[in-house]
Structures are given as structure tokens and as C-alpha cells.
């Protein structure tokens, strides 16, 4: 189920986001308020509820400062369906490229998967029990006695013995033959978007008409348990109920993140002719979806009136005012994200629960190599990251990944031969590995 936003105040949402994302408090606050407003809307009377539309958000800031991560983490927090779409992939209707309605179909597909996983979790105990009964039957058939009389006499005893051994984990490496169903072969070109737009689910239709193919596969009991539990869970859940719940969740809680949003705005002060006409065409195609319309999908009709849209872009060559007025009005909340400083980089390296340094240390620990970063080493890394971003292209926190990969390349290569060793990385080590590359502009441009 969705985490009740009644339990999460805007302040609590920001606090949870702080565990993973450094800084950008204004963006976090705006997102937290938008999520809380969804809860407030659900408490309104039905007539007024339909009138309250979500306030879509426009995030403005360079790459790598946390635009996508804030939205993704928030969606994960409340278990809302979330998709990230690059709007540059869309073209005007009638041209080669993705139709803008495909974003809604992708959101519903994501919602279906989310709800299915939750339903599987709800029936997991029962499904596992039924799967283990099937495994016992398979083990009995694999080891059945050649004597029919003996089989009938000892069947219960042998079944009890196998059950005890199975629960003790003694049969995990035994092999059983499992029947797997395969979907009938279908040509996706014959079942394209034009049929989906009419609300026709050809995959489901052909699945009912054509006989399902099956194959028998030999696998260990451990592998079979996963496969059979999934099969049993599928039998226990109601697909129609899943579809209905998923559509409702997509409609009321779905988040569509429109990346590269600045790329469909006309360039400020530049005359690019036909290109600007094409960009405006994409904006006008997106507009009805953002304003609220009904899209036919293979799972049913989906209303977009209360889906939250987040437009995000750097807006270097254009500005929000270059979007068509109607679309500007649909993104009333504007949030500017700050470029990251050396202090931000230092905090990113050390504070989050999934901090980068902890990730690299954990990876090398699998080779039994213990790595320690001194305080001055972390400060030096933060300084270098800021310097390279200022002197080449500002890619925000993504720069840390390239710098750390370069720093630890030699250590990662020789780690299997260094079992049991402890390595201390200090500022001198950082300078030895990176100083020449950082100060040489051509090298830093291509390597970092």
C-alpha cells in the first residue's frame, strides 16, 4: 500500500530526503508541500476534489544537482508510480518519434508492476506454502519407487520425510523438473500504439485464443521455489483488481518527470526557424496531457487530470518564459536548484546513508581489502571536484563518480592480489593520482 501521507508532514518528508540528498532545501520543501497537498485533496468532498488540480513543478538547475533524485526518492518514499521521460524523444503527431501519450502508458505499466509486487507480497506466505507442496510432489515423482505396491504403502511416510528434509534445507541442491509456461509468439508491430489507443489489448486477446506453450526445465529446489512461488502468487491475485487499483494509483499519485524540458523551449534571442516550430509543436502536444485528458491504454482508460508533472532542465540557452504561455501556466511552482560547492561535495562524500565513499569501501571489502579515507583526502577530493566543474563543464555530483573511478582505478585492478591488506588514502595519495590530470585542462576535459 501507499504510505499514508497523513503520517508524513512536509517537515518529515524533507527530513527523509535529507538522508539521501545534500542541500537543495527549497526544492525539497516544494516537493514535500506538493505531496502533502495530494493528501489534503483526498479529504475534500467529491465535487470540490475534482476541481483541485495538482500544482506542477518546474525545476531549474544544471545537471547533477539532484533534480531527478529528489523526485525519484520521494516517489519511492510514498510508493507512487514514477517515470522519467526525456521530452526530446517526443515529436509532433504525424512524425517519426514517440507519441506524447506513451508517457501515460509507461506510467500505468509502472503502476501495474508496483501493485503486482505488493499483491505478491500480501500472498507470499500462502504462495510459498503451495510452492513447497508442489516441490514435494516433484521430488516424490523424481524418486518414485519402481514397485507400485511399495509406492502406495510408503507414499505418506516418504512424503513426510521429504517435507522434513525440505524445511531443514537439506534438499536445496536437489534437481527437479518444473513446467514453465511461455507466452505465444506475437508480432509487436501488429499490436502497435494505434490498437492501444482504441483500448484493445491484443496481447491479452491472443493469450486467451492461442494455446500457451510450455517447456520443462530442470533446476535446483532453491531455484524452483522462486519460480513456483511466483506462479502460485499469480494464481492467488486478481488481475482485474490489480489493473483497476494500478490505474487509480497512477491517476491520483503518479509522478511523470519530464527531463530536458528546456530543450523544447524556443532559444532566447535566437532565430532557429523550423526547429522552433517543431519545438512548439511538441509543447502543444504535451499540453492536453498536462491540462487533463483521457488516454486509452491496454489496461483501460486513464485520466491525467491529477497526475503530477515535474519539468526539469538547465535552461542555459532558453528560459521558462520561452515556453508557450499555456504550458507555462501549467507549471506554477518554479524552483531553482543551486550549483554544488566544495562544501556540498564534502557532505555528499560523507553524510548520506548511501554515501559514495561507503559504496567504494564496501566493494573493495568483498576482496578483503580495507580502505580508509583520511579527512584531508576527502577535503582534497571535494576541492578537485569543484575545480574541474568550474574549469570544464559543470556536471554537478556526477563529477565525483569520474574522479573516484580514476582515483581508485589502480587499487581496484590489484585488489584481488591484496587480500587482508589495509590501505589508507590521504591527500598526498589523491594528489599523486589526480593532480596532473586535474590541472591539465585537456586531460581533465576527457578523463574526468
From Swiss-Prot:
Residues binding ATP: 22, 64-69, 259, 326, 398
Q: Which InterPro entries match?
A: AAA+_ATPase, ATP-dep_Clp_protease_ClpX, ATPase_AAA_core, Clp_ATPase_C, HslU, P-loop_NTPase
Alphabetically, the GO molecular function entries are:
ATP binding; ATP hydrolysis activity; peptidase activity; proteasome-activating activity
Q: Where in the cell is it found?
A: Cytoplasm
Q: Name any GO cellular component annotation.
A: HslUV protease complex
Q: Which GO terms describe its biological process?
A: protein unfolding; proteolysis involved in protein catabolic process
Keyword Nucleotide-binding listed? The answer is yes
Q: What is its main location?
A: cytoplasm
**What is this protein's function per UniProt?**
ATPase subunit of a proteasome-like degradation complex; this subunit has chaperone activity. The binding of ATP and its subsequent hydrolysis by HslU are essential for unfolding of protein substrates subsequently hydrolyzed by HslV. HslU recognizes the N-terminal part of its protein substrates and unfolds these before they are guided to HslV for hydrolysis.
NCBIfam families xrefs: hslU, PRK05201.1
The UniProt similarity line reads: Belongs to the ClpX chaperone family. HslU subfamily.
What HAMAP family is this protein classified in? HslU (MF_00249)
Please state what the protein is called. ATP-dependent protease ATPase subunit HslU
**Mind giving the lineage of the organism this protein is from?**
Bacteria, Bacillati, Bacillota, Clostridia, Natranaerobiales
